[in-house]
Amino acid sequence: MKIILIAAMSVNGRIAQSTNQSSLEWTSKEDTAFFVEKTKETGVIIMGQKTFETIGKPLKGRRLIVLTQDKSLESQNIALDENGTRLEFVNETPMDLIHRLESEGVESVVIGGGSFVYSSFLRERLVTDIYVTIEPVMFGSGVPIAESFGDIKLRFVGSKTLGEQSVLLHYEVV
């Protein structure tokens, strides 16, 4: 299975100034367009509850799986329309979730944040590809893209300019 980590970050490696800040507040429209395109291509997005709360709604035409420790949310798994819009709240380890999705025939997923979720999937060595958009901003403090996961070797696949100011980098995990 392809497990694709997608993140936008500041030049100094921050994905937000605080845990309740949406990346939509400071990233380029081209980065948003890339995220929409890639997540529609895979059809399945995994993110943490805090990241979901910054978005506040399901993503049209995609299956959104929200990792949460709030057991009361787990019963709120909803198929919202015939176009594949689906919202699920789960309390599973990354490995268990990936095994379940593979058994369902899912071929690729996007890991959409935040830092804790990125770190969890990296720690378990599940990520196969990383797309990072570098935005032209530096935050004096904030949320790191990931931490506490050990060294990971990457192979540079390519880069692309998004708009006039942002750069999208693609790496494969080796």
Predicted features, each with a name:
Residues 1-174:
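Enzymes that bind and transform nitrogen-containing heteroaromatic metabolites
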